[in-house]
Structures are given as C-alpha cells and as structure tokens.
Design a protein with these regions (language model features):
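Hydrophobic anchor at the beta1->P-loop junction of P-loop NTPases
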Residues: 40
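Active-site catalytic microenvironments for nucleophilic, acid-base chemistry
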Residues: 58-62
Length: 162
C-alpha cells in the first residue's frame, strides 16, 4: 500500500498533554464498559448470548453489574440468531420483570445496506439509549470474507455509530 503523506506528523508534547483538560470516558458499566465499540468473543456455546441478554436487561433496569454501578437507560439487543420465542424463554430464565426500556430485534439490515440508518432511527426515537448489542457481528456483515481489511472496514462503521 502506497499512502504517501506530504505533511509532517502532528504530535503533542508531554507537558501540553498533561495540561490539557480532557473529558473522562462515559461508562455504561462503571470502570468496565465505556461508551464505544466493544467485542465480546469466545468459543461457541459458552454463554455469550446469555451474557449479552443479561447485560441488556440489567443496564435497562439500572441494576449493578458484578457490584459495579450502571448508567440506566434504554438498551437495544439485536439478537439476530434467535427467535422471539427463544428470547422470551431466556428472559423468563433471567428475570421476573423485563422493563420496557430494553428492546429486542431479530432482523435488521446489513452494514452499509441500511443498518446504520436503522440504528440512527432507533437512537433518535430513544435518545436515552446507553447500550446497543449486536449478536452476532457476522449476521450484519455484507461480505463473509473474514480478511483483516473487511474486518477493519465493518468495525469502523460500527465504531462511528458507537
């Protein structure tokens, strides 16, 4: 790749950086989950979807996650490998009362083919949204070519949304 840049590096010296007032990150789960893009990865069938569901419900309720406070707000869980019945069954397993501030969706557009607009529309309708979970990433990718370049491109789109 030949990306010649005709300008010098833009740097900041240590003193200037230390003197610059910067905003701390906003945490959805205090000290654990900051605003932004995160990837939950692990072996198949170890409970990642259960964890995602529990996290969506717990944050929507404003309850602590492992003794860490949460920023209560609307959550959106794109559970793209599940049916509504499966989600309901799992909800009954983890809680007696799911709040109306946790939303579930089993179908959505792909990255670059409408997903960004769908999420933006949801966020506009629910401005207090603090967490969006996509389960699984592969279900929203338009190309099933797992090259680094495609990974980077797709994750960059999601990072801009975050």
């Amino acid at each position: 790749m030949n990306n010649k840049m005709n300008h010098p590096l833009i740097t900041v010296d240590g003193r200037t950086l230390m003197d610059r007032p910067l905003e701390p990150p906003n945490f959805v789960v205090d000290t654990l989950l900051a605003q932004g893009l995160h990837i939950l990865a692990g072996s198949p069938k170890v409970g990642k979807s259960w964890l995602a569901l529990w996290l969506a419900v717990t944050v929507a309720k404003g309850k602590p996650v492992w003794n860490m406070s949460t920023k209560q707000g609307t959550t959106l869980y794109l559970c793209l490998e599940d049916s509504v019945l499966r989600i309901q069954n799992r909800l009954f397993e983890i809680t007696e009362d799911a709040p109306d501030s946790v939303h579930f969706c089993t179908e959505c557009a792909l990255i670059g083919q409408g997903l960004e607009e769908q999420v933006d529309t949801f966020l506009a309708a629910h401005p207090d949204t603090v967490l969006v979970i996509i389960d699984t990433l592969q279900m929203v990718r338009p190309v099933h070519d797992a090259t680094y370049a495609n990974d980077y491109k797709d994750l960059s789109v999601l990072k801009r949304l975050a």
